Amino acid sequence: MEKEVDKKFVWVIKDLNVFYPKQSHSDPFLIAGSRWRLLALPKGTNYEFFYQYMGVADSCQSLTSSWRRHVKLRLTIVNGISHKRSIVTDSDLYFDENLPACSYPTVPPPFNLLARDAGFLICREITIVIEVVSLEVIGTSNNDGANSIDLLKQTQQIIDVNGFQVLPSQVESVKRIFEIYPNIASEVPSMKPCLKTLYMNVLLGIIETLCQLPAELSDTDLDEASIAVLFVSQGGFKVDWLEKKLKEVKEKKKNVDNGKARLQQIEEDLQKLNQKRLDLKDILDKEKANDLTANVPLSFNDVLKMF
């Protein structure tokens, strides 16, 4: 029986074999009347996670008239040591009546997912939380038999840019990418639109990360960006330029961190010098007071005074 997702769906992957990962999947869950589940597919000694769309639920067959959904899901790979180390990924998914069963890859998990000291694998279990961030209904039921492609053109919620379906807010960024790197997707193999959209969202997410101040980026942010670049590259995108930019940002981050360390050392040295200055001033004031006390002439009576 599918679970209707209100805010969160928790999947605990149990009895994981670190040396021989095996494919597994969550129980089905419902989002906006559609059936989904999460797949964990082994890749080497790690896992890749996929959202799998499984069609309209039996109890919601009224959705089979022309309709389209846009749902934003947040996947969190929980870290048992520190919440700050948890891996959080947002994905924009689009599905409609005519879309067959389709798997949407998420950003690959951290390289140390199964490491004993990383905090993700606790008692041979990994916990994944799926949250519905937003849900948008694009179009409504009608009787004219209009298919989802016509409905998409009418609502203009998604725009095609060089074969990629993107949101209106992403159009200028995607166009700019293709203007500067027209061959970026020339070797991308034929794939379903949902997968192409996922890859483009990951690419835009990497660029957004690199546009932040180096001082605001953590090492984890940059590690995740490296994994994401590899993910996009494996999808057939030519992202040598992005790898160079990532390397450049990492170098800037290193320089900023080193600069912070030097500044901190200088501030500590300055604080010590200031304290030494204050200590010397106290000594100087005491010496001046002693000097004033000693530098007093004897009076006539003082000279005549007997001991």
From Swiss-Prot:
CDD domains per the UniProt record, alphabetical: MATH (cd00121)
Recorded coiled-coil stretches: 238-290
Leader sequence residues: none
Keywords carried by this UniProt record: Coiled coil
Every MATH domain range: 6-132
Domain of life: Eukaryota
Membrane-spanning ranges: none
The name this protein goes by in its record: MATH domain and coiled-coil domain-containing protein At3g58380
Protein source organism: Arabidopsis thaliana
Source taxonomy: Eukaryota, Viridiplantae, Streptophyta, Embryophyta, Tracheophyta
